[in-house]
Amino acid sequence: MLHETFTIELPYEELGIKQQGSATITTYIKDVFPKDQDPFKRPLIVICPGGGYNHHSPREGEAIAIKMLDMGYNAVVLRYSLAPVTYPAQLFEAAYTMKYVRDNAAEWDVDPDKIIIAGFSAGGHVAGLLGTGWNSKRLDYLLENVLHCSHEYVKPDGMLLG
């Protein structure tokens, strides 16, 4: 399994956000097949744990990711920035995460048309922000000048809110 954590690097001040964000992405990717085989492309779920924007619930992150692996999904846990970091930082971090997943879909044997975002409680709010606001003008500067991709590229293919 490919299991690694890294920090999301965004120019928060340039994006109009006063506090520096502290978001991370942790991958839970099943073993990747050799490229000369015709591998099964798995769906992937981006998981946003809840916690009232003051912590990330441990039972809504890794535990859910492992369960999703058992169900045939690859998973990524987005630990978005918490208070005092304010909106739209979490929306930007979710968009960044979707781009990162799509950029790595071929390498991870992920079906690029089956990338879902899920969230619980406050994480459900973050998932809903991107799931319903992927084409928002709020994302224009980030997508055009920082991530260099289209609105459609960060659009989730499905949403699960809990």
Language-model features, listed with the residues they occupy:
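Short amphipathic alpha-helix adjacent to the substrate-entry channel of hydrolases
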Residues: 39, 57-76
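N-terminal cap/lid segment of alpha/beta-hydrolase-fold proteins
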Residues: 1-41, 87
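Short beta-strand element of the alpha/beta-hydrolase
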Residues: 41-50
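Glycine-rich, phosphate-binding/catalytic loops in enzymes
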Residues: 62-65, 94, 133-136
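Primarily recognizes the serine-hydrolase "nucleophile elbow" in alpha/beta-hydrolase
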Residues: 99-162
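Catalytic nucleophile-loop/oxyanion-hole region of alpha/beta-hydrolase
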Residues: 56-58, 78-112
